[in-house]
Regions:
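Short, Lys/Arg-enriched N-terminal segments with co-localized hydrophobic residues
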Residues: 1-11
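Bacterial N-terminal signal peptides that target proteins for export
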Residues: 12-23
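C-terminal motif of bacterial Sec signal peptides marking the signal peptidase cleavage site
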Residues: 31-35
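Short, solvent-exposed loop/beta-turn-alpha elements that line the ligand-binding surface or hinge
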Residues: 82-86, 168-185, 230, 281-307, ...
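Helix-loop-helix "hinge/cap" segment bordering the ligand-binding cleft or interdomain interface
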Residues: 170-173, 196-271, 292-344, 401-438, ...
Length: 599
C-alpha cells in the first residue's frame, strides 16, 4: 500500500511530525517493561495498579482509580497498564484485508492476546488484496456493514462526508479514549481532516526511509568495467555509456523499463525526468495527478506542459534513436523485465529502474548477478538540474481506522485500537506478543540500521509462508523512521548478502538520492499531498482526469519514439490538453489545495 500526508505546510509540519514521533518513540522505549508479552503482563499490571492505588488512597478507593484508568483518564497504556481491560468490554464486527501469510485472524495468537488484554472481542470480516474494495463497497451500499473498518481505506468523501455511514471522530478523540494516539499525533490531527473539516479516520505511520527515495536506477558495474568507463554523472555521459554498451552488445538493453504502474517505480521516465525538472508523481497511480506539482507561489501546475518537460522528451528521443530505449520499455510487465534481466547471455541489461533490486534478482538463487548492480544517482542535466523525487508525504497516512454508525460504543472502539499506538503495539502485531521470544528491547551492544544503539531486536522474523502467530502486515502500522531504523542490524552485514537488503537500500538512498531531493536542491517545484476532495469534486473531474492522463501518456511515447515530431507536434499536444479540460482539472486541485491549507 501507499501512504500520504494531507497537509501542505511542508517545512513546519514535517519537522513537527518528526519531532513528535521521535519524542513519542524515545519515551516509549525508555519504559522497557510496560506493554505486551504474555509472561509479564499480569506482574506489570499488579505492580502498577498497587502504585496507583497507594497514590490515590487519600481521595478515592483503589477500585475507583482502576476504573478510571481503564477508561483512559489521560494516562497512556505505556504509563499505566491498568488502562486495559477497558471499562465496558464489547464485541465488535470489523472489516479488514486478509493476507495469504496469515491463516485465520479469528484464531490467531495475537488476536487472542489482544482480546485477553483489552476485553474487546473482534468478529472479523475480510477481503483479499484483490477483492476487498468491491466487497466492502457492496456492504456499505447494502446497509449490512460492520462496526469498524481498519487496515483498508474506503471512499471517505462518499461514505463519510456525504452519506454519514462512517462517523466523524472529532468528539471521541480524547485523552480518555486514545491517549497513545494523541501522544503521537496530537499536533497533526489536521492531516486527517476531510473536505468538510472533520476527522473520519485515524492516522498511522510506516516511515520507510528508502521508500521516500524510490525512483532508483540500477546499473550493471561489470559492463562499465568491461567498457572502461566510470559511473556516468551527466546526461551526456549517460548517452555515451549507452552508445558504447550497445556497440559491444548489439542485442543488449541499455535502459530497461516497464509500462507505468506495472512495477514499483519501474518506468525509466520517473528517474530520468529529474535531469530536467521534478517528476512529482506518487506510487501506484497512473493518472494526471502524477504530472501535477505545486510551485513556490503555491500555484498548482502541470509539469507535462513545461518547456523543460519538452527538453526531457527530446533527450529521451535521442536515446531511442541509438537504441538505448526500446519499445518494450513502454509495454512490458515487471515479470517480463525480470525474465530479461535474469538472462544476461540473451539480453544483457545495463540499466533497470526499480525501487529495490530484489524485485528483479534473487540474492540467494542468483547472487553473482545480484552483486553486479549498483544504484546510479540522478544525472546532471544540460542546465545543471539534478533531482530525485523525495516522496515526503509517503510516511504518514489517514484512512487507517474508521467507525461506522452501526457501532454502539465508539469510545471503547478507540480504546481498543489505541494499543497499536503504544510502544510495543507494532512489535506485537507484526512479530508476536511474547517478549523475549518474538523480540527484545534495547539489546545490549547492538546497533540499528542508522548506526545508533538498537531499540529492539527481532527474534521471530517476518514470514512469507502461512502462519498464525501474528498479524504480519494486516492492520495498522505504527512505525516511525527512528523505530524502523532502530532495529538491530549487524554493522558488518554484507549489503549484497541474503540479510543485507535493508542496508543496501538505506545506503543507496542516503548517498545517491537524498542529496538530490527537491528540498535539498531548493527546486522550484514540489510534490503535492493527497487531494482531499469532496464526492462532487471527484465526480466533476473524473472524466477529465482520465482523458488528460491518456493524452499525456500516449503523447509521451509518441514523442520519445519519434512517431510524432516533437517540434511540430508540441503546440497541438498542448491544445489537446486544453480541450480535454486541463485548466478545469488544475482549478479543482487548486481549490482543494487552498482549502486544505486553510483548515
Amino acid at each position: 500500500m501507499h501512504f500520504t500526508i494531507l497537509k501542505w505546510e511542508v517545512k513546519m509540519k514535517r519537522k513537527a511530525l518528526k519531532q513528535a514521533l521521535a519524542l513519542s518513540l524515545a519515551g516509549a522505549f525508555a519504559l522497557g517493561t510496560a506493554a505486551c508479552g504474555s509472561s509479564s503482563t499480569s506482574d506489570s499490571g499488579s505492580t502498577d495498579s498497587a502504585a496507583a492505588s497507594t497514590e490515590a488512597a487519600a481521595s478515592t478507593e483503589s477500585t475507583e482509580t482502576a476504573a478510571a484508568a481503564s477508561t483512559g483518564s489521560g494516562a497512556t497504556y505505556d504509563d499505566d497498564p491498568s488502562f486495559y481491560p477497558v471499562k465496558n468490554p464489547q464485541e465488535f464486527t470489523a472489516f479488514t484485508m486478509s493476507m495469504p501469510n496469515v491463516t485465520d485472524l479469528a484464531t490467531n495468537d495475537f488476536t487472542k492476546y489482544l482480546e485477553n488484554l483489552t476485553g474487546v472481542k473482534i468478529d472479523f470480516e475480510t477481503g483479499s488484496r484483490d477483492d476487498w474494495q468491491e466487497k466492502l463497497n457492496l456492504e456499505l451500499s447494502s446497509g449490512d456493514y460492520p462496526d469498524i473498518i481498519f487496515g483498508v481505506t474506503p471512499d471517505l468523501a462518499k461514505y463519510g462526508v456525504e452519506e454519514g455511514i462512517i462517523i466523524p471522530l472529532d468528539d471521541y478523540l480524547t485523552e480518555e479514549n486514545c491517549p497513545e494516539y494523541l501522544k503521537m499525533f496530537k499536533d497533526q490531527l489536521d492531516l486527517s481532516r476531510e473536505s468538510d473539516g472533520k476527522i473520519y479516520s485515524l492516522l498511522a505511520t510506516n516511515d520507510c526511509y528508502h521508500c521516500k527515495y524510490a525512483d532508483k536506477m540500477w546499473i550493471n558495474t561489470k559492463y562499465l568495467d568491461e567498457l572502461g568507463v566510470d559511473m556516468p554523472t551527466t546526461t551526456d555521459e549517460f548517452y555515451d555509456v549507452c552508445q558504447k554498451f550497445l556497440e559491444k552488445y548489439p542485442n543488449g538493453i541499455a535502459l530497461a523499463g516497464t509500462a507505468p504502474g506495472s512495477g514499483w517505480h519501474s518506468d525509466f521516465q520517473e528517474w530520468l525526468m529529474g535531469s530536467f525538472l521534478l517528476y512529482p508523481g506518487r506510487s501506484y497511480t497512473t493518472n494526471a495527478y502524477d504530472y501535477t506539482a505545486v510551485n513556490k507561489d503555491g500555484k498548482i501546475v502541470c509539469v507535462a506542459t513545461d518547456d523543460r518537460y519538452k527538453d526531457f522528451l527530446e533527450y529521451c528521443n535521442s536515446l531511442y534513436k541509438i537504441g538505448a530505449i526500446y519499445d518494450g520499455d513502454f509495454t512490458q510487465t515487471q515479470e517480463q523485465l525480470k525474465t530479461l534481466v535474469n538472462n544476461p547471455d540473451q539480453s544483457p541489461v545495463l540499466c533497470m529502474p526499480e525501487g529495490t533490486i530484489s524485485d528483479y534478482i534473487d540474492v540467494v538463487s542468483n547472487p553473482d548477478l545480484y552483486k553486479e548492480y549498483a544504484t546510479l544517482a540522478p544525472l546532471e542535466g544540460p542546465d545543471g538540474t539534478r533531482l530525485t523525487t523525495y516522496y515526503k508525504y509517503s510516511a504518514v497516512s489517514s484512512g487507517n481506522f474508521m467507525i461506522t454508525d452501526k457501532c454502539k460504543d465508539p469510545a471503547t472502539a478507540l480504546q481498543w485500537v489505541d494499543f497499536f499506538y503504544s510502544s510495543k503495539g507494532d512489535l506485537c502485531s507484526q512479530y508476536g506478543a511474547d517478549e523475549g521470544t518474538d523480540w527484545v528491547l534495547n539489546p545490549e551492544g547492538e546497533v540499528g540500521l542508522n548506526g545508533k544503539p538498537a531499540l529492539y531486536k527481532i527474534l521471530n522474523g517476518y514470514s512469507g509462508e502461512p502462519q498464525n502467530h501474528d498479524w504480519q502486515d494486516i492492520g495498522i502500522r505504527v512505525a516511525p523512521e527512528d523505530y524502523r531504523l532502530g532495529q538491530a542490524t549487524d554493522p558488518d552485514v554484507d549489503p549484497y548478502g541474503p540479510d543485507g537488503l535493508e542496508k543496501l537500500l538505506y545506503d543507496a538512498s542516503a548517498n545517491n538520492y537524498a542529496p538530490y531531493s527537491q528540498d535539498e536542491q531548493n527546486a522550484d517545484l514540489d510534490v503535492l499531498p493527497e487531494m482531499k476532495m469532496s464526492n462532487d469534486e471527484s465526480s466533476a473531474i473524473s472524466t477529465i482526469d482520465v482523458e488528460v492522463e491518456k493524452i499525456i501518456s500516449e503523447s509521451q511515447v509518441a514523442f520519445i519514439t519519434g512517431a510524432q515530431d516533437l517540434d511540430s507536434g508540441w503546440d497541438s499536444y498542448l491544445d489537446s490538453l486544453n480541450k480535454a479540460g486541463l485548466s478545469d482539472l488544475l482549478s479543482t486541485y487548486q481549490a482543494v489545495y487552498d482549502r486544505m491549507q486553510s483548515q
